[in-house]
């Protein structure tokens, strides 16, 4: 397999497998890969001692919060080869994992099981209605039931609810309230190599769901916030009369300054 796909630019890590054992055959597989490609690291969550980087599957949030501080002596860099199982209404706790992972430069992230629901069109024999068919819907026995329906996308690649949660958590810039009475927010540039100068930063204020201050430009962070840096900035609320009985939200948008 390595020979067949070695020139694919999208491949950055080789994996020795998923959910198998720690046998000596994996040591030999690692050696074989290195005779072909020494430019990419190799991971294998069942035996971190024989590969180039650390990994595991489905750790608790508490474990990740400890591991990023060096509590467990894990091998860096670290990549959680599976940490979320997108079945049903899942992946609602991603932000807790990522707040821990993004607190260090040594955790590379993790992989979600998986991208797309694996089903095909089937039809109700009575009504003729079309639906997504999977395990058992075609009279197949034995089958794995709905364990092929784990995606953040439907079989036709339309997004499920999980998709929007993942998109939000995986965004390259983070914004956090620090002191909203005084308009202070924190901007975190999650990128590893580029500052925020490619973006126009625009914020709007909403009162009880209605926009009361629109498209205000925040120019300072564009050049000031470098890769992996956090800085506080003040929104100019001097022209707004805040009502103690109202609910307020600030929407901050990062728009490309130039078309790309």
Segment roles from a protein language model:
Residues 1-150:
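Substrate-binding/catalytic cleft of secreted carbohydrate-active enzymes
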Residues 100-260:
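Carbohydrate-binding surfaces of carbohydrate-active enzymes
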């Amino acid at each position: 397999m390595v020979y067949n796909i070695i020139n694919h630019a999208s491949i950055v890590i080789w994996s020795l497998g998923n959910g198998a054992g720690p046998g000596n055959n994996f040591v030999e597989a690692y050696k074989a890969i290195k005779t072909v490609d020494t430019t990419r690291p190799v991971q294998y969550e069942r035996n971190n001692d024989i590969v180039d980087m650390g990994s595991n599957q489905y750790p608790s949030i508490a474990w990740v919060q400890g591991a990023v501080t060096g509590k467990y002596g894990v091998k860096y860099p670290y990549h959680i080869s599976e940490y979320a199982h997108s079945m049903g209404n899942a992946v609602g706790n991603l932000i807790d994992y990522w707040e821990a992972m993004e607190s260090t430069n040594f955790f590379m992230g993790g992989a979600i099981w998986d991208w797309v629901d694996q089903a095909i069109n089937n039809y109700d024999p009575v009504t003729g209605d079309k639906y997504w068919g999977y395990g058992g819907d075609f009279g197949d026995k034995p089958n794995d039931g709905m364990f092929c329906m784990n995606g953040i996308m439907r079989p036709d690649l339309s997004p499920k609810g999980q998709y929007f949660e993942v998109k939000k958590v995986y965004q390259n810039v983070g914004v956090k309230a620090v002191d909203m009475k005084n308009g202070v927010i924190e901007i975190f540039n999650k990128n590893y190599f580029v500052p925020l100068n490619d973006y126009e930063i625009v914020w709007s204020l909403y009162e009880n769901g209605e926009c009361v201050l629109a498209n205000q430009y925040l120019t300072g962070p564009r050049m000031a916030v470098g890769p992996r840096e956090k800085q506080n900035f003040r929104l100019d609320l001097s022209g707004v009369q805040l009502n103690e009985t109202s609910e307020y939200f600030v929407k901050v948008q990062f728009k490309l300054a130039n078309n790309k």
